Structures are given as C-alpha cells and as structure tokens.
Design a protein with these regions (language model features):
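Conserved acetyl-CoA-binding loop-helix of GNAT-fold acetyltransferases
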Residues: 438-441, 447-462
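Terminal substrate-recognition subdomain of acyl/acetyltransferases
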Residues: 311-336, 354-355, 440, 460-517
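Active-site flanking loop/helix segments enriched in acidic
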Residues: 73-105, 137
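Conserved acyl-donor/pantetheine-binding loop and adjacent beta-alpha core of acyl/acetyltransferases
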Residues: 381-438
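Histidine- and acidic-residue-rich, metal-dependent catalytic cores
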Residues: 99, 106, 126, 147-203
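Divalent metal-dependent phosphate-bond-processing catalytic cores, especially two-metal-ion Mg2+/Mn2+ enzymes
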Residues: 2-62, 92-94, 105-121, 133, ...
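Short amphipathic alpha-helix that is part of the acyltransferase structural core
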Residues: 58-59, 317-361, 368, 374-385
Length: 517
C-alpha cells in the first residue's frame, strides 16, 4: 500500500511481503502424488477433515449459504493447504484440520447467538472464509504463520478471489479479520496488525471517520481470534488437548517443560478485560458437550501444572532423586519385564495416540538386542520409571509410509520414532549410525535435568557399542545452542516451517561430560 505524508491510502496497490524461500517447481506435483491415498479417503469421507467438511456444509445449509460455493471453497482450502505441505502429514499446529475446526466453531457459534447479539449473515460469511484461510502461509520460515504472507498468498490466488466474490463479501474485510488473529495481540505485533487493518478498511471503502463500522470489524476480528484459540480444545478430550498444546508450543515458542504452565496462562488470557466479553459470547453459544470439553481440558492443564509444582518441589528439596539405568536388553537372562514394557508404553502414550498403528513395532523393538534403552527412574536403578530414551540402528528406522492417525489428526510417527519422509542420510546402509528417538518424560519431571541425563547416557552407550554417529530430530534453536557450546553436532536436513531439523552427532569428537547423577 502506498501511504502519503498524511498517512492516507492513495492507491489500491496491495501490501507486499515476499516469502523467504521459493519452493521447487515440482513440489506441488510431488505433494499431490504423495497425498493421493489420503485424498481417496477424504473423498469417501474417511478422514477427520472430511468429517469437519460435512458438519460445516450442514451448518451452512441452515444459514442459507450457497451450498455449491461453500463446498467449492472448502475443497479449495483443503487442496491448497495439502499440496503446499500443510495437510494431514504436516507435524505442526497450523494445519488444514485446525483451520476447518476454527471454521466449524465460528459458524456454529455465530449461528447460535442470542437475538441481542445476532451476527448479520454477511459477517458470518466473512468469519467463515477468514477462518478457513487464516493460517495459509505455505512458505513460512517458522511454524507460526505470518499474516502479511497470508495476505500475499490469498491475493495472488485468482481462483480463491472468484470464490470469495461468489459469497458477496469484500476480500479486504476477510484479510483484515485474518490480521486480527495475530497472537499474542500485543506490542509491536498489535500495532502492525491494527495499522494494516485500518488500511484494509479504507481499501474496502470504509471512510476514515466511520469509526463505528471500523470498530465493528475490529470486534468481529476479535470474535474470530477467540474461535481460533479455543476451537480444537472444544472438540476433543484431554489427550487431544495435550497434543494440540505440544504442537502449538512450537509455533508460539514454548519449551516443552513449560507447556502446562503456559497453557494455564494461555487460557487465563481469555478472561482478561479485552477478551472476556467476547469469549463469554462464543463459549456460551456452543453446545453443552463442547463447553464441557473446553472447561475439562482447561482444568486438566491446571491440575497437571499443580502436580508438576509438587514434583519439582520434591526434587529440589532432594526428597526424591533422578537416576538413569541402562536396560540390559542384550543379556537374555535380564530382558525387560512385561511390567517395565507397560510402564514405558504408558509414558509413550503421553506423546503418541493410544491407538497408534506402530505399537506392535515399538513393543517388539524393546526386546531387540540392537536397541539401546535408557530409563529415568526415581531414587535407584530399580525405582519407578518416569522417562526413557530409546534408539537403534539407522537402518531399522526407515520412514513409515501410508499410516495416519485420524483420531489425533497426526502421523503416528509424530513423536519421531523413525525417519521422516523426505529425510536423506548418506550413512543409511553403512551400519555406522544409530537413530535416537525423541526422549519421553512423564509430566512433572520435565525441566529437572532428566532429559540431559538420558541423552548423555544414550550417547555414551552408542559410542561404547562402536557407532560413529548418533542422529535424531530436534528444534533448530536447540541444535544451534549445542553447536555453539562446542558439541560436534551438525544439521543434516532442515525443515523450514516446523523447524524440527534432522541432525548428526560425530561420536569420535564427542567429549564425555561429568555425569549429572
């Protein structure tokens, strides 16, 4: 947008933010081919996204939306998100599934408002379309979308422009609502979003002195923001809520050890002065079952945080101590017991779906002599297990294809128990590398050096067994910090959006530190 000296819009030229990286020309075709099995299931109604679509179409019919136009724009959203890498196989939070959830909750809530709060049909359409595309940033550098880039992609999509026009709404208003979903809506982010929103109001023909209309759309944007923040937590149980929180943590930048604490703060923010009234409007317009889900999940995070505080206090008072134990899988006389296996599986279920298709493979690997299994225990090497790390030869961790967990809307390998599809390692087949799966620690014991202890013991055991390299996935920031501290670690393959990169540690250069325990 071109602004004159008086800060007034003088041209309809759009606000351009260039994406950081251009994807290869073949990428969309590759994604379409790879997602063909998923598309087949989607088209016959066997995916979670298809279920959301059906519910949205049912609501839209009651609101006298054009059924064909609604169906087309949903299909376009699903197609665009999927072929740009934000579909069912994307490990982050801001997926097409999330956008469909927000669209569904927005429609449901808007249609159930009391007479005094009734939302006009045109505004409901604005809400719906903005909800569908509010996270559409396929070339983002970070997991969290950039609203300026979202605007760019939406404006450059001619087909979407025609679909939006068929709803009889203004594209500029839709984009203004999307800018209001910026989170957290504070500081420089808030200033930037508000400035752009008012520019868009002017592009939509709303005069500068028409304060009431501008304020009306600001409130509508806040309504969308509330729906965005609570949608997923209204639609599932606490296991689903924990999965959403873990995914969302990556986008917002929370460390895994503060997820419960930050989740409590996240939900408490809905009760703050600026958001409280709108939150009450939204939550009380939803069915009882959805309200119960939401408040049960909020209480679940609060109880988990309180339990965390109790455990951390005991650890810091030295009432309990953490120790690591190498489970002797190689010794036939001392293989892990069924009780130990069940406890490890229980901890694993805090990170993966209990209906995980790979349960059998995981259990089998626990009894494999090539597996390294380190447990984190309380007080002694025979104490209660509160965490573990496991891994094995790289060759036994090849990508798993074609399986997708509909209940949680994620790949079962989301906990990084195998190589991600698309990861290429030059050492695969050389039998010189061991893959370390993600560390799993029970809620409450995170952040008390347990993860460091498990990782250190795993690296030492890998070197003792003659491996040259340890590979795994981690957040880019953590990899960089370790490298800066002198660890012989390198990023082998970057994943720009989620920033969960594949790395390699050279064990020949690894200097053993003094054991913490």
């Amino acid at each position: 947008v071109i602004i004159d000296e008086n800060d007034q819009i003088t041209s309809n030229e759009i606000h351009h933010i260039t994406p950081s990286k251009t994807l290869p020309w073949w990428y969309e075709y590759y994604k379409r081919i790879r997602l063909f099995p998923w598309w087949t299931r989607y088209n016959i109604g066997l995916t979670k996204e298809a279920s959301h679509k059906d519910k949205i179409l049912e609501l839209a019919a009651k609101m006298n939306f054009d059924k064909r136009a609604t169906s087309k724009i949903i299909r376009h959203a699903v197609s665009e998100f999927s072929k740009h890498g934000l579909g069912s196989d994307y490990p982050g939070y801001h997926t097409i599934n999330h956008n469909l959830e927000v669209a569904f909750i927005s429609l449901l809530s808007a249609g159930n408002q009391k007479v005094e709060n009734k939302i006009p049909d045109k505004d409901i359409k604005n809400l719906f379309v903005a909800a569908l595309f509010h996270d559409f940033d396929p070339r983002k550098e970070f997991e969290k979308p950039n609203e300026d880039n979202i605007e760019l992609f939406i404006r450059n999509d001619e087909k979407l422009g025609k679909l939006i026009h068929s709803f009889g709404i203004d594209l500029n208003i839709v984009i203004a609502l999307i800018h209001r979903t910026t989170y957290p809506f504070a500081g420089a982010q808030k200033e930037h979003a508000l400035k752009r929103m008012h520019e868009l109001y002017s592009l939509a023909g709303i005069q500068q002195d028409d304060i009431n209309t501008r304020r009306h759309y600001e409130k509508l944007g806040l309504y969308l923001s509330i729906c965005d923040r609570i949608a997923g937590y209204c639609l599932g149980d606490f296991n689903y809520a924990k999965e959403l929180a873990r995914r969302n943590a990556r986008g917002i930048g929370w460390h895994s050890q503060v997820i419960n604490e930050k989740s409590v703060e996240f939900f408490s923010g809905l009760k703050q002065k600026d958001d409280k009234d709108t939150f009450e409007r939204v939550i009380h317009s939803l069915p009882i079952a959805f309200r119960k889900n939401f408040f049960d999940n909020v209480e679940g995070f609060r109880e988990a945080w309180e339990k965390e505080l109790e455990i951390k206090a005991s650890l810091r008072k030295k009432e309990i101590n953490l120790v690591t134990s190498l489970e002797n899988i190689i010794d036939v006389k001392n293989k892990i017991t069924k009780d130990m296996c069940d406890m490890i599986m229980k901890i694993r279920y805090e990170y993966c779906s209990p209906t995980n298709f790979y349960d059998r493979d995981f259990r089998k690997s626990l009894y494999d002599s090539s597996t390294i299994l380190i447990t984190l225990r309380i007080n002694s090497k025979i104490g209660e297990i509160v965490g573990y790390v496991k891994g094995g030869p790289l060759e036994k961790h090849k990508p798993k294809y074609g399986l997708y967990e509909e209940n949680l809307g994620k790949m079962n390998s989301g906990h990084m128990e195998s190589l991600r599809r698309g990861t290429n390692d030059q050492n695969l087949g050389k039998m010189n590398s061991i893959f370390m799966e993600w560390i799993a620690i029970r809620t409450g014991y995170l952040g008390e050096k347990g993860g460091h202890m498990l990782r250190s013991e795993f690296l030492k055991e890998a070197r003792r067994r003659g491996y040259s390299y340890v590979t795994s996935y981690s957040q880019r920031e953590l990899i960089t910090n370790r490298k800066n501290k002198g660890e012989p670690i390198e990023i082998v393959q970057q994943y720009d959006a989620a920033m969960i990169d594949y790395y390699r540690i050279d064990l020949s250069q690894f200097v053993e530190s003094i054991p913490i325990n």
